[in-house]
Amino acid sequence: MPPPDPAAMGTWKFFRASVDGRPVFKKEFDKLPDQARAALIVLMQRYLVGDLAAGSIKPIRGDILELRWHEANNHFRVLFFRWGQHPVALTAFYKNQQKTPKTKIETALDRQKIWKRAFGDTPPI
């Protein structure tokens, strides 16, 4: 997958179930260890400018992407999709198995549908 064009990048958006709701993603993200959060934030920033190392991002299903970070045997993930020029973070979690858990993928797909119902298929111009 080619890196995104930095000139076309927007800003990170965080999943929330309604226009005025608190971002659910942030609650999940806050549960991760400090070091994992810091590393994932750096990766998220690097994604915006197209400066990710090989293996830091992986397509999961449909247009859901996985941002990946690990230290030793501890693996952390952010699942997201592109909403126009903006990446939308859907869920964050610790991964303790070989494959990304199907429940996390289903959560991301469900949240993507909810986001698009609440905010539209593309952001307003």
Curated annotation (Swiss-Prot):
DNA repair as UniProt keyword: no
Knockout-associated phenotype: A triple higB1-higA1-Rv1957 disruption mutant has no visible phenotype.
Keyword presence, Hydrolase: yes
Alphabetical list of InterPro entries matching this protein: HigB-like (IPR009241)
Record-level Gene Ontology MF annotations: RNA endonuclease activity
Pfam families reported in the protein's UniProt record: Gp49
EC number annotated for this UniProt entry: 3.1.-.-
GO terms (BP aspect): detoxification; negative regulation of growth; response to hypoxia
Protein induction: Induced by hypoxia and by DNA damaging agent mitomycin C. Part of the Rv1954A-higB1-higA1-Rv1957 operon, as well as the higB1-higA1-Rv1957 operon, which is probably the mitomycin-induced operon; the former but not latter operon is autorepressed by HigA1. Induced in persister cells in response to D-cycloserine.
Its job: Toxic component of an atypical, type II toxin-antitoxin chaperone (TAC) system. Upon expression in M.smegmatis inhibits colony formation and cell growth. Ectopic expression in wild-type M.tuberculosis has no effect on cell growth; ectopic expression in a triple higB1-higA1-Rv1957 (delta TAC) disruption mutant causes growth arrest, killing a considerable proportion of the cells.
Family: Belongs to the mycobacterial HigB family.
Protein name: Probable endoribonuclease HigB1
Biological classification of the source: Bacteria, Bacillati, Actinomycetota, Actinomycetes, Mycobacteriales
